[in-house]
Amino acid sequence: MMWELLKLRTVLLLALSTVSAAQAGQTEVPDELGAMTLDARVDESVMGINDKLVKWRRDLHAHPELSNREFRTAEVIAAHLRKLGMTVTTDVAHTGVVGYLRGRSEHPLVALRSDMDALPVTEQVDLAFASTVKGEYLGQEVGVMHACGHDNHMAMLMGAAEVLAGMADEIPGSIKFIFQPAEEGPPEGEQGGAKLMVKEGVLQDVDAIFGLHVFPSALGTVQYRTGGIMASSDTFKIKVKGRQTHGAVPWGGVDPIVVAAQIVLGLQTIPSRQLDSTLTPSIVTIGKIQGGVRSNIIPDDVEMLGDRKSVV
């Protein structure tokens, strides 16, 4: 958990420094002496909740929930924020939770954000807190796992809430804690995620916002840059329509599986041959192919689900 503590500490320092600087009308962080004092206090507070961070993260990891279905997760988070004396709003963008910590003044208002949802992935490790949860995704029963680190993010933001709540009387501003559902995308036919949270006004009056994502980088490092740092993602569906026939007489129909295979290979030439990868990093992935019911019957159609990521 040491890397989680380090990143939690970074978020806390960013939030407190931003509030202090904005309150003073500055564009830079507070003076060096003040920053050192803040640094030491945050270090002490963060180390004091180490055991809680481990407990929260393992509990959340053992009970993952899919997008727009984060019901237990929301209850755990809301109960924690209420225990800290915050004003808590639930059911934001379906299952989102927002906590408000009033400091010495309403503004500057700095927001800290975490995602909440898990992925339709079966966990394959033998740990006491490994997920055994099953869920439904695209009409199929699937394993559910926090395979993208959102359990870490939630534990860190719960920790940030606890530390900052203990310093509320000294914060020259206020803090909003945003727990966002459906970061992985809402179920088909539903709204959700960041867009719905913004639509419902979660960022109203917010002066600055911070978020992070865990990454398998060197311990004790934080990566950042001006502008975009994470890739944007768009999903797509392709349906190839053929004509059913027996596998013994493929010339009697149109084989959509062969066509689908050509499409999969052809798509890979877009990022590798049509885009300058030194200027426009991009990836195209086909994550699901579904078609046919028997080994010797050429089906009528094949459906593919894919994802493209690009840095803009």
Which stretches of residues belong to each language-model region?
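N-terminal secretory signal peptides that target proteins for export/translocation
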Residues: 1-6
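Bacterial N-terminal signal peptides
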Residues: 7-20
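Boundary at the C-terminal end of the N-terminal hydrophobic targeting segment
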Residues: 21-27
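Acidic/His- and Gly-rich active-site-bordering loop/insert found
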Residues: 28-146, 152-176
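Short Gly/Ser/Thr- and Asp/Glu-enriched loop/turn motifs at secondary-structure junctions
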Residues: 92-96, 281, 299-301
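Hydrophobic beta-strand positions in extracellular immunoglobulin-like domains
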Residues: 101, 240-242, 308
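Histidine/acidic-residue-rich, glycine-tolerant segments that coordinate divalent metal ions
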Residues: 134-145, 151-152, 163-164, 169-288, ...
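Conserved small/polar residues in nucleotide/adenosyl-binding loops
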Residues: 311-312
